[in-house]
């Protein structure tokens, strides 16, 4: 039986969804960039890394975005909103990614060429809905890393999936292949977040044999 929690386990326990932020707190862009760069170690389908980030830290833009965000207060009062976008044409990055793997010595040329061919062939034949579903999954994975890294740096966050995605895409003139999927508010809390219960562990796990 594990008795003492690791630093990672404590961080995961302490991370909460915070919706009340101290207005007027500025997070240096260098810190946000550091969080997002470190988060890119997240896994993704075929390592195609379909995530893209749009950081909104201008107060007037956050105020305007609150309307598309169904009037959620934290969109305006947090220090910044990190919009996580999903590229549903992720297979077009296969060559760049795998060429870099060769350059860095991570894989031989023949394996990289196979990865490029397989990714371009398979993903280009998936439907747009299938590719979007893959991007959704990968965006969720990197978003979890973002909020844990933010917590480790002393900031609180909340992940939001409920916002007018069409209005967001129009406002920021996103290309058709970049789909807004998640908004992450980040900042300093104005009050502690509530704890939240979890289903009994025995209810959510079973072994196959």
Task: Tell what function each PLM region has.
Residues 1-209:
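Acidic, surface-exposed loops and disordered segments
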């Amino acid at each position: 039986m594990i008795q003492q929690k690791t630093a990672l386990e404590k961080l995961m326990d302490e991370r909460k969804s915070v919706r009340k932020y101290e207005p007027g707190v500025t997070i240096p862009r260098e810190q946000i960039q550091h969080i997002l760069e470190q988060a890119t170690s997240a896994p993704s389908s075929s390592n195609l890394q379909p995530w893209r980030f749009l950081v909104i830290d201008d107060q007037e833009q956050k105020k305007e975005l609150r309307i598309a965000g169904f009037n959620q207060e934290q969109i305006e009062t947090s220090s910044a909103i990190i919009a996580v976008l999903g590229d549903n044409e992720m297979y077009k990055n296969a060559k760049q990614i795998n060429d870099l793997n060769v350059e860095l010595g991570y894989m031989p040329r023949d394996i990289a060429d196979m990865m490029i061919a397989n990714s371009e062939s398979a993903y280009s034949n998936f439907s747009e809905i299938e590719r979007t579903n893959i991007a959704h999954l990968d965006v969720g994975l990197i978003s979890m890393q973002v909020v844990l890294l933010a917590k480790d740096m002393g900031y609180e966050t909340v992940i939001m999936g409920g916002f007018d995605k069409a209005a967001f895409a129009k406002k920021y003139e996103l290309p058709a292949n970049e789909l807004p999927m998640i908004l992450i508010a980040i900042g300093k809390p104005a009050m502690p977040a509530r704890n939240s219960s979890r289903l009994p562990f025995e209810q959510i796990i079973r072994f196959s044999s």
